[in-house]
């Protein structure tokens, strides 16, 4: 696509600069693309056509700071797909957005206030929320800037924030409808509670950590005096009471019962009897339930329904009282004995254990490893807490009048994957998705925070609840119900993942039936890390299908997580994070140290982090540019695996960009000023070969995009550009331009520029900036745009393989030429010739092939001449055999000196072989050395042996 305009961001008369400097190019071209509207839906497609939509939604980054390497990886994959489909002619929509990230954002802003010795309670809710909005504006613009730096061709007019007015409307509408359908309800339930944040947290936000704890064994005396039981060995045993074991003795203050298995013969006669609750003026019953393991410990457990998830279910089944013993900040409340009231939970533990021991209720204490649940945001040990919360019913059948009546939202989500409407890449994630949905619990969606979507529910003074889209609507409901007086809004906010789950359809205008919603839902693919399949992916499927009847996306591409070079998770506390912008622009050592040691949760870690950073990056991080970073990310994108990120890979792909730049300079120098549009000219076998290879590249790249194998795309581009086009074809083209006829020169020049132009289009989705800059110059010469016209590679047709251009004969001819060149280079190495020394080659074999290849051999193997003979002379020189050809360098040598040199080399190699055999024959070395070191030594031995055989062969040819 081209459109005439006077302003072209490239000086067409200026020569391409000598070196690739990405910074200036990136800023200039991103602004230009956005200004021209290439990223906007519908703007880049041909008028009068009805292209198919191709839609990708950002997984919205949290507005809690800056993008990390995982975001850079995600953006590379998503933008690569979008640019590819834009060039295919699809109507691409790449929807950007950011997430309000309730808990995470509130923590960040509260920390800022803490530094000023101010709490959110000092400010009040309204002022605090204002502060968060201020911070969001600052952080959100930083993130947007970073996304642009990564080259994301996003449809910026569609940018959203999950608390924008239009998004908030969709959230409220969804909540109200689900409530009216009986699929959202409020109830007193046991939840994971963060006593620092004072909010419920999702099961998925719980991180379990193994710790060294204790098991306390406590005696609960029988109220009726000692009882007898028959133990497992058949002995009659008299018990003063029941002994239970617990890792949390402080919670015994809330016990409601003791429980045994109903089929445990030891305790059947004790069912219904009462025991004393130590330290409390209460008696509790002995009950039976199948959940008890009779073979674990004494086969008796305590039931603390308000502070343990297993106990909670048991207590409900048996109507056992739920006694809450903790305040919301985890101190003993008024339900505990007076002596413990007001104590923090761990202080209470010490006091309870001391009192149990003093009153002889403590039987014994044992060390015990245990899993401790912690909040992933605060690291605080979570407390099961009985509170009033809002829930989404995950397994309840939807009522009549909904889009899927009689089916739960979970059933519908499972069916969408089972029948192929949604496909996972790689496929194994389907199993994980299904396992989670088949074991799902109702979703607690309320959070006791100030930042987020406030729950659209209002309460009357007598406790009636009115769920409505607005306070006015709630008032109308109250009046209709005969309720007078003020209404108070529920202070809680919704789980961040609730609003995020609505993104696939609320971003396109739902609940209105908009043209965008009809055209762009479902998205084509969701690109995401496996860590949020449950948090986000499954919930998007459930809610999108329930509210709209459509799947949210057709494909889910699941990638691994970015780790450091040693495979460690990147985290601020480890000091091993990398900012993608630092890899693009570079950062000096002092700046990197400051960035890694600033704002640590534990400032004591700063010294170790600084030391490690100075050791790892003594010169800081060089500027690689966006294209090199993107190429690196694409090359790492194997299906589903975690990625150990190594900066050396970035350096390699920066070198690739330099190679492409320099190749373009060479091509332009040899093609500019020549009339290369139209047909004509004579194509050599080398010209036909590089065009034939291009077809294979185009097919491989197309297959890679279709299969989400971005590593294959990147590797195919790298191999073709570096190995085939630059290292071989450019060298062959030099020969053809210098020695060919005018028709041959024209054919080669046309091939040089046309293949390069196609390569730039092929590589554009991966490395957009350098390809745009180079294409502007190359396209003029290749006849793909006219001088003065505005055009962009980003909206050019994507190259497709042409089977008619595959040339097996040319492929075979170049393969043979390559083998001959490499054979002559091997001869030069064997004869220890310097690179500058030009020597003649004598060749025996097929005359037509050798004569055709002679000028290329002379140029690429640094030969003074190539003589084709009927038979090689008996000169005692080494010979290389390539197919039917025999090749020999005709070099006059001092035989005595060469014999002496070879004898010396033989002695050296024999010494190396003896040393290697000595090591490998040493059992201690083989057993104790790392396997990699042993394998390396074996490889050295094999290499020395192979070289020795060749050198001995040369020595034999020279005689005594």
Swiss-Prot record:
A motif ('KMSKS' region) lies at residues 569-573. Its main location: cytoplasm. The keyword Cell wall biogenesis/degradation does not apply. Its EC number is 6.1.1.9. A motif ('HIGH' region) lies at residues 61-71. One of its GO terms (molecular function) is ATP binding. It catalyses: tRNA(Val) + L-valine + ATP = L-valyl-tRNA(Val) + AMP + diphosphate. GO terms for cellular component: cytosol. One of its GO terms (biological process) is valyl-tRNA aminoacylation. It is an enzyme of class 6 (ligase). Keywords: Aminoacyl-tRNA synthetase, ATP-binding, Coiled coil, Cytoplasm, Ligase, Nucleotide-binding, Protein biosynthesis. CDD domains: Anticodon_Ia_Val, ValRS_core. The keyword Protein biosynthesis applies. Belongs to the class-I aminoacyl-tRNA synthetase family. ValS type 1 subfamily. Monomer. Catalyzes the attachment of valine to tRNA(Val). As ValRS can inadvertently accommodate and process structurally similar amino acids such as threonine, to avoid such errors, it has a 'posttransfer' editing activity that hydrolyzes mischarged Thr-tRNA(Val) in a tRNA-dependent manner. This is Valine--tRNA ligase. It comes from Bordetella bronchiseptica (strain ATCC BAA-588 / NCTC 13252 / RB50). The lineage of its organism: Bacteria, Pseudomonadati, Pseudomonadota, Betaproteobacteria, Burkholderiales. The gene is valS.
């Amino acid at each position: 696509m081209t459109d005439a305009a006077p302003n072209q961001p490239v000086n067409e008369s200026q020569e391409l600069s000598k070196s690739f400097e990405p910074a200036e190019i990136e800023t200039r071209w991103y602004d230009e693309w956005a200004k021209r509207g290439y990223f906007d839906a519908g703007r880049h497609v041909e008028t009068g056509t009805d292209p198919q939509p191709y839609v990708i939604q950002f997984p919205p980054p949290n507005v809690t700071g800056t993008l990390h390497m995982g975001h850079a990886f995600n953006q590379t994959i998503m933008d690569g797909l979008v640019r590819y489909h834009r060039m295919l002619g699809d109507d691409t929509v790449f929807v950007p957005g950011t997430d309000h990230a309730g808990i995470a954002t509130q923590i960040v802003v509260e920390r800022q206030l803490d530094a000023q010795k101010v709490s959110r309670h000092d400010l009040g809710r309204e002022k605090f929320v204002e502060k968060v909005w201020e911070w969001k504006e600052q952080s959100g613009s930083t993130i947007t800037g970073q996304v642009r730096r990564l080259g994301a061709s996003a449809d910026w007019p569609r940018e959203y924030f999950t608390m924008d007015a239009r998004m908030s409307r969709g959230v409220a509408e969804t909540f109200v409808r689900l409530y009216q359908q009986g699929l959202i309800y409020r109830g007193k339930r046991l939840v994971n509670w963060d006593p620092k944040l004072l909010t419920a947290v999702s099961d998925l936000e719980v991180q379990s950590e193994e710790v060294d704890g204790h098991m306390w064994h406590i005696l609960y005396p029988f109220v009726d005096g000692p009882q007898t039981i028959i133990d497992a060995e058949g002995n009659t045993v008299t018990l003063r009471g029941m002994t239970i074991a617990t890792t949390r003795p402080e919670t015994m203050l809330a016990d409601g019962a003791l429980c045994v298995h109903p089929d445990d013969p030891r305790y059947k006669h004790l069912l219904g009897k009462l025991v004393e609750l130590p330290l409390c003026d209460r008696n509790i019953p002995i009950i039976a339930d199948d959940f008890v393991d009779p073979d674990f410990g004494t086969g008796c457990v305590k039931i603390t329904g308000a502070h343990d998830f297993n106990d909670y279910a048991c207590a409900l089944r048996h109507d056992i009282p739920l006694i809450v013993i903790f305040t919301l900040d985890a101190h003993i409340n008024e339900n505990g004995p007076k002596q413990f009231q007001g104590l923090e939970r761990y202080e209470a533990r010490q006091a309870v254990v001391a009192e149990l021991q003093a009153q002889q209720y403590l039987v014994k204490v044992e060390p015990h490893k245990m899993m401790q649940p912690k909040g992933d945001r605060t690291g605080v040990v979570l407390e099961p807490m009985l509170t009033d919360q809002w829930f989404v019913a995950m397994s309840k059948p939807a009522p009549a009048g909904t889009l899927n009546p009689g089916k739960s939202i979970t059933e519908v989500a499972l069916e969408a994957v089972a029948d192929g409407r949604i496909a996972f890449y790689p496929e194994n994630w389907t199993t994980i998705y299904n396992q989670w949905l088949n074991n799902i619990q109702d979703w607690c969606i309320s959070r006791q925070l100030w930042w987020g979507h406030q729950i659209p529910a209002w309460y009357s003074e007598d406790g009636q609840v009115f769920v409505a889209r607005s306070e006015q609507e709630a008032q109308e409901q109250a009046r209709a119900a005969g309720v007078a007086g003020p209404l108070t809004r529920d202070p809680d906010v919704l789980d961040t993942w609730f609003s995020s789950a609505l993104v696939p359809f609320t971003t396109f205008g739902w609940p209105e039936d908009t043209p965008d919603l009809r055209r762009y839902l479902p998205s084509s693919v969701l690109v995401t890390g496996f860590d949020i399949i449950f948090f986000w992916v499954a919930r998007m499927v459930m809610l999108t299908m329930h509210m709209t009847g459509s799947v949210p996306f057709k494909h889910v591409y699941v990638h691994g997580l970015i780790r450091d070079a040693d495979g460690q998770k990147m985290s601020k506390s480890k000091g091993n994070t990398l900012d993608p912008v630092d890899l693009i622009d570079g950062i000096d050592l002092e700046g990197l140290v400051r960035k890694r040691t600033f704002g640590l949760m534990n400032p004591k870690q700063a010294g170790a982090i600084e030391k490690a950073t100075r050791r790892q990056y003594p010169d800081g991080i060089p500027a690689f540019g966006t294209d090199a970073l993107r190429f690196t990310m694409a090359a790492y994108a194997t299906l589903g695996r975690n990625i150990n990120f190594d900066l050396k890979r970035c350096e390699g792909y920066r070198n690739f960009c330099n190679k492409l730049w320099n190749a373009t300079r060479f091509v332009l120098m040899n093609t500019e000023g020549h009339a290369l549009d139209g047909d004509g000219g004579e194509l050599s076998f080398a010209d036909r070969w590089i065009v034939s290879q291009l077809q294979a590249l185009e097919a491989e790249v197309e297959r890679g995009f279709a299969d989400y194998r971005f590593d294959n795309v990147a590797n195919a581009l790298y191999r073709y550009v570096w190995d085939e086009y630059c290292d071989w074809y450019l060298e062959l083209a030099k020969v053809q331009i210098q020695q060919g006829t005018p028709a041959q020169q024209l054919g080669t020049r046309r091939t040089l520029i046309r293949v390069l132009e196609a390569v730039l289009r092929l590589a554009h989705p991966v490395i957009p900036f350098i390809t745009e800059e180079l294409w502007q110059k190359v396209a003029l010469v290749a006849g793909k745009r006219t001088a003065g016209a505005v055009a962009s590679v980003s909206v050019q047709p994507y190259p497709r393989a042409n089977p008619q251009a595959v040339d097996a004969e040319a492929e075979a001819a170049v393969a043979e030429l390559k083998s001959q060149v490499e054979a002559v280079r091997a001869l030069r190495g064997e004869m220890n010739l310097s690179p500058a020394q030009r020597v003649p080659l004598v060749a025996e074999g097929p005359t037509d092939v050798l004569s055709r290849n002679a000028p290329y051999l002379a140029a690429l193997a640094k030969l003074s001449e190539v003589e084709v003979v009927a038979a090689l002379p008996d000169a005692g020189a080494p010979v290389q055999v390539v197919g039917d050809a025999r090749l020999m360098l005709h070099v006059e040598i001092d035989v005595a000196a060469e014999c002496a040199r070879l004898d010396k080399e033989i002695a050296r190699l024999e010494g190396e072989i003896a040393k290697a055999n000595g090591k490998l024959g040493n059992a201690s070395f083989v057993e104790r050395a790392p396997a990699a070191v042993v394998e390396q030594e074996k490889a050295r031995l094999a290499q020395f042996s192979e070289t020795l055989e060749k050198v001995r062969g040369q020595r034999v040819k020279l005689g005594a």
